Amino acid sequence: MENTQENPATQSAEDIGSAKQAAQGAAPAAEAADAALAEAQAKVAELQESYLRAKAETENVRRRAQDDVSKAHKFAIESFAEHLLPVLDSLEAAAVDTSGDIAKVREGVELTLRQLTSALEKGRVVAINPVGEKFDPHQHQAISMVPAEQEPNTVVAVLQKGYMIADRVLRPALVTVAQPK
């Protein structure tokens, strides 16, 4: 009968040899895995840095936009006020005039009124003077209805001008409207 058992020393040497071969085969795979891991970690770090930069840039843009809006609100009236200053100068000059000449005062008031109207127009404030137009409840406020020759609901008289700034009614015109016949 043959000895089916191998010598433990021989078996151990074979195991060591095959383990070395396996280790040698695994070493390049482990190195490749380590390299891939290092590359992935570097990519993650790069992406995190890019994310943080983008987040900081977004915050800076948002903050700058808020500052711009705040400044726009704060100084929106600046241009309008600049257009009103000549009107103020004219009124102050009239207040210190002691000549007593009514014709001069009237002429000064008319000039000042033109200056004021011009300043308002530069600020996009325009008068609503709707005589002869159809009554519009968005721009007019009817004070009374009177019998008139015009069509019903037509503005007959303006008691107080209205004003619009851009497309928004600042103050509706107070009007008298023709009543139905």
Swiss-Prot record:
This is Protein GrpE. CDD domains: GrpE. Belongs to the GrpE family. GO terms for molecular function: adenyl-nucleotide exchange factor activity; protein homodimerization activity; protein-folding chaperone binding; unfolded protein binding. NCBIfam families: PRK14139.1, PRK14140.1, PRK14150.1. InterPro entries: GrpE, GrpE_coiled_coil, GrpE_head. Participates actively in the response to hyperosmotic and heat shock by preventing the aggregation of stress-denatured proteins, in association with DnaK and GrpE. It is the nucleotide exchange factor for DnaK and may function as a thermosensor. Unfolded proteins bind initially to DnaJ; upon interaction with the DnaJ-bound protein, DnaK hydrolyzes its bound ATP, resulting in the formation of a stable complex. GrpE releases ADP from DnaK; ATP binding to DnaK triggers the release of the substrate protein, thus completing the reaction cycle. Residues 1-34 are annotated as: Disordered. One of its GO terms (cellular component) is cytosol. It is found in: Cytoplasm. Homodimer. The gene is grpE. Keywords: Chaperone, Cytoplasm, Stress response. Residues 19-34 have a biased composition (Low complexity). One of its GO terms (biological process) is protein folding. SUPFAM superfamilies: Coiled-coil domain of nucleotide exchange factor GrpE, Head domain of nucleotide exchange factor GrpE. Residues 1-13 have a biased composition (Polar residues).
